[in-house]
């Protein structure tokens, strides 16, 4: 190591002295370069600046990576021309790794690496060196920068960063067809030696594929590899550094290669003849069988198209491809009939949809097979001669008239007789009948075209030998019209004419309607009735298009002379027999302005422009009257409700004055009238009469406070009094009450005041004994409560 570094120093000296000139300078690998010049001021020795050549004898050092020696690895030596070997110069080191990775001998300038280095972790270190005077600590040279490069060794194997790989190549490809390019990377220094020079090779996958040693491009090595023989290939690729030489490191990866399909195989039928059996009753469009051609290709290259080759019976059948199974589905295009033809033979061709022109030389990509179809006999229902029967009949045709017939036949071998009947689910059974054997249809009722113009029902035919086999056909019967109704004028029946009308003015256009409906359409004619032809005020102008105009014949009309005119119009139709009717048009004379706008006529004429008739006006007036009556009734009820609020709460009750010495009817009489009628909210009782004293007389009147004069209350009482006096069913308010009869209770609650004025402790009920035998029960009850002493209870 020392020898190599000494060689670097020697070469630098030779280059610096001009003794050697580099043939091919490579800046990135320069071992020594010419030192830079700098201006140094030497104080005390020179009075001017002088350019001094710096005396460094190095520029770049190298150190091996992954050094595992026991001693620190020697890197190189720093030296200055000012160092005379007297020990007065001190060398310092700073920068990347100074003190941690690299150390320097301050006296000799020797640099050592104190730990193992990895180039892949850090390829070089930039440091700064300086020579200073030991005594003065002043720099002898400006600080200078140098580089220590980590020299690479082959310590990293190649790696496939994108592996494993997946690739594909079409089958039947020629030799050298491109498949895939693989790439391996080596972390070693590619600029130094062969440590990063990778060479590719195939360890597994020959002889099908090959690889370029330098580029890693994989290509086919065999021609015409068939996917149907083998589809998947696994190739093992190796990448080795050191140019593939012995001792180089290697890495491997797997490449999975798939042969993609091409259309190199035509479809083939597994057999040449297919036999099918089809019942003759199979419906049109139904699938009657399947055939299949086999294609070993895959995907769209295996898609097959089937076609029927024109020939015997091919026009009765059709074939389509099932996209899921690639089978040919044979369908029935026309109905089969065993009695007509019992067997059919035709050819079917199968071909690929997507052809590859590279393989046309191998032959046509299609195959042909024969299909034989046998028709099976089926017992079929009768067949009608027509799919639909249309018949016509005049209305009012006599019952039992035959209007048509239907025919059905049994086409099977050994045909059976056929019976006919009307389908009970249709509406024609009650109006028509059918002969079960002959199939003739006759009327069963009188038909009225104005009631129903068309009948639609079904006829069923069944075989006598097998009634379950039936067929059905629709019957359409049109009822023809007989001209039995005269035409009538269409609305309006009324119109108006202005007083200032001129002769020849059309004041109204009228049309006609006819309940008869002729298939060719009706033609109506209009004219005046014979009685109106003499000196007519109006005339009828027939427009020959089923309308007519009412035309004035006078120069002005007077409302005072005649307000209404009645114009008879004769309308005649064109059917046979001819029908006509006379219709009367009412014409009202109205006052109009110069433009013909009606100004005044009558209530109805005002609304003529908007199309309101007399009935509509009457309905509007009736609604207005009903609405007014509802409003008046509502107001009256509101006022009556305000007058009736003369009563307050239920507690304001006026007690009746009862004679207790009367042996009368009792409390049942008091229940027959409404006590609420005597309630008065404005009466306020200031004092109540004590009931615990003996009354002065047998009948005491209740003391009532003065009531202010109120006219409303007085009128109310008098009115109620008169009503009850006039009512013989009303109970008398002054009826006698007999308390010897224990009634159902009194709503007046006249005796409740006995226990409502004071508490039991404050009242003395001895006076009840003085009132006589009638109050003995009350005296005993309250007297016992008064004398009750709980201490005497044993």
From Swiss-Prot:
The chain crosses the membrane at residues 610-637. Keywords: Calcium, Cell adhesion, Cell membrane, Cleavage on pair of basic residues, Glycoprotein, Membrane, Metal-binding, Phosphoprotein, Repeat, Signal, Transmembrane, Transmembrane helix. It is found in: Cell membrane. Residues 55-609 are extracellular. Coiled coil: none annotated. Residues 55-160, 161-269, 270-384, 385-487, 488-609 form the Cadherin domain. It is a single-pass type I membrane protein. Glycans are attached at residues 256, 456, 537, 545. The modification Phosphoserine is found at residue 787. Residues 638-794 are cytoplasmic. One of its GO terms (molecular function) is calcium ion binding. Residues 1-23 form the signal peptide. GO terms for cellular component: plasma membrane. SUPFAM superfamilies: Cadherin-like (SSF49313). Pfam families: CADH_Y-type_LIR, Cadherin. Residues 24-54 form a propeptide. One of its GO terms (biological process) is homophilic cell adhesion via plasma membrane adhesion molecules. Three calcium ions are usually bound at the interface of each cadherin domain and rigidify the connections, imparting a strong curvature to the full-length ectodomain. Cadherins are calcium-dependent cell adhesion proteins. They preferentially interact with themselves in a homophilic manner in connecting cells; cadherins may thus contribute to the sorting of heterogeneous cell types. PANTHER family: CADHERIN-12 (PTHR24027:SF96), CADHERIN-23 (PTHR24027). This is Cadherin-12. It comes from Mus musculus (Mouse). The gene is Cdh12.
């Amino acid at each position: 190591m020392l020898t190599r570094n000494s060689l670097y120093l020697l070469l630098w000296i030779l280059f610096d002295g001009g003794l050697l000139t580099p043939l091919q300078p490579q800046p990135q690998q320069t071992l020594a370069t010419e030192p830079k010049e700098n201006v140094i001021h030497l104080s005390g020795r020179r009075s001017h600046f002088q350019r001094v050549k710096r005396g460094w004898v190095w520029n770049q050092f190298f150190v091996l990576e992954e050094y595992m020696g026991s001693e620190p690895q020697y890197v190189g030596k720093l030296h200055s021309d000012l160092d005379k070997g007297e020990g007065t110069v001190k060398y310092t080191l700073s920068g990347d790794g100074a003190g941690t990775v690299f150390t320097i001998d301050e006296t000799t300038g020797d640099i050592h690496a104190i730990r193992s280095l990895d180039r892949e972790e850090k390829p070089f270190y930039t440091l700064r060196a300086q020579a200073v005077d030991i005594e003065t600590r002043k720099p002898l040279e400006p600080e200078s920068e140098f580089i220590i490069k980590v020299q690479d060794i082959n310590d990293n194997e190649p790696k496939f960063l994108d592996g494993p790989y997946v690739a594909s190549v079409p089958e039947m490809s020629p030799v050298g067809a491109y498949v895939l390019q693989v790439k391996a990377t080596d972390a070693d220094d590619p600029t130094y030696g062969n440590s990063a020079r990778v060479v590719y090779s195939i360890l597994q996958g020959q002889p099908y594929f090959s690889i370029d040693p330098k580029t890693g491009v994989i290509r086919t090595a065999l021609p015409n590899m068939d996917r149907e023989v083998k589809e998947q290939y696994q190739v093992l690729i190796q990448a080795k550094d050191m140019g593939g030489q012995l001792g180089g490191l290697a890495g491997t990866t797997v490449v999975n290669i798939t042969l993609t399909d091409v259309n190199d195989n035509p479809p083939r039928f597994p057999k040449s003849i297919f036999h099918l059996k089809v019942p003759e009753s199979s419906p049109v469009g139904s699938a009657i069988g399947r055939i299949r051609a086999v294609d070993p290709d895959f995907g769209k290259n295996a898609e097959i198209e089937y076609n029927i080759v024109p020939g015997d019976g091919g026009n009765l059948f059709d074939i389509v491809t099932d996209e899921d199974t690639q089978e040919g589905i044979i369908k029935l295009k026309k109905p089969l009939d065993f009695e007509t033809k019992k067997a059919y033979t035709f050819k079917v061709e199968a071909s690929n949809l997507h052809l590859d022109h590279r393989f046309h030389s191998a032959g046509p990509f299609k195959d042909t097979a024969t299909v034989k179809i046998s028709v099976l006999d089926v017992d079929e229902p009768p067949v009608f001669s027509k799919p639909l029967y249309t018949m016509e009949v005049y209305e009012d045709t006599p019952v039992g008239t035959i209007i048509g017939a239907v025919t059905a036949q049994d086409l099977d071998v050994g045909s059976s007789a056929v019976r006919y009947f009307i389908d009970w689910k249709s509406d024609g059974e009650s109006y028509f009948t059918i002969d079960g054997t002959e199939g003739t249809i006759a009327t069963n009722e009188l038909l009225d075209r104005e009631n129903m113009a068309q009948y639609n029902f079904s006829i069923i035919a069944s075989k006598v030998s097998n009634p379950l086999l039936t067929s059905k056909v629709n019957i359409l019967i049109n009822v023809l019209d007989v001209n039995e109704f005269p035409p009538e004028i269409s609305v309006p029946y009324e119109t108006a004419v202005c007083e200032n009308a001129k002769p020849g003015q059309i004041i109204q256009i009228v049309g006609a309607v006819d309940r008869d409906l002729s298939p060719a359409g009706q033609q109506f004619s209009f004219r005046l009735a014979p009685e109106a032809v003499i000196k007519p005020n109006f005339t009828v102008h027939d427009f020959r298009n089923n309308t007519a105009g009412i035309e004035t014949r006078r120069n002005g009309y007077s409302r005072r002379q005649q307000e209404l005119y009645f114009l008879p119009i004769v309308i005649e139709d064109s059917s046979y027999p001819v029908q006509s009717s006379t219709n009367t048009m009412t014409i009202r004379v109205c006052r109009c302005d110069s433009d013909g706008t009606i100004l005044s006529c009558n209530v109805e004429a005002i609304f003529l422009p908007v199309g309101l008739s007399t009935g509509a006006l009457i309905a509007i007036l009736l609604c207005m009257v009903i609405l007014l009556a509802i409003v008046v009734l509502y107001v009256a009820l509101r006022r009556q409700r305000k007058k009736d609020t003369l009563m307050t709460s239920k507690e304001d009750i006026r007690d009746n004055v009862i004679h207790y010495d009367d042996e009368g009817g009792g409390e049942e009489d008091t229940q027959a009238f409404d006590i609420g009628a005597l309630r008065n909210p404005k009466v306020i009782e200031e004092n109540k009469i004590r009931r615990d004293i003996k009354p002065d007389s047998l009948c005491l009147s209740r003391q009532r406070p003065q009531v202010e004069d109120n006219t409303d209350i007085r009128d109310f009482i008098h009115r109620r009094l008169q009503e009850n006096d006039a009512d013989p069913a009303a109970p008398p308010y002054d009826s006698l009450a007999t308390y010897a009869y224990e009634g159902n209770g009194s709503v007046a609650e006249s005796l409740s005041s006995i226990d409502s004025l004071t508490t039991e402790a404050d009242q003395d009920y001895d006076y009840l004994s003085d009132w006589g035998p009638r109050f003995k029960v009350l005296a005993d009850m309250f007297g016992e409560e008064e004398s009750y002493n709980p201490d005497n209870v044993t």
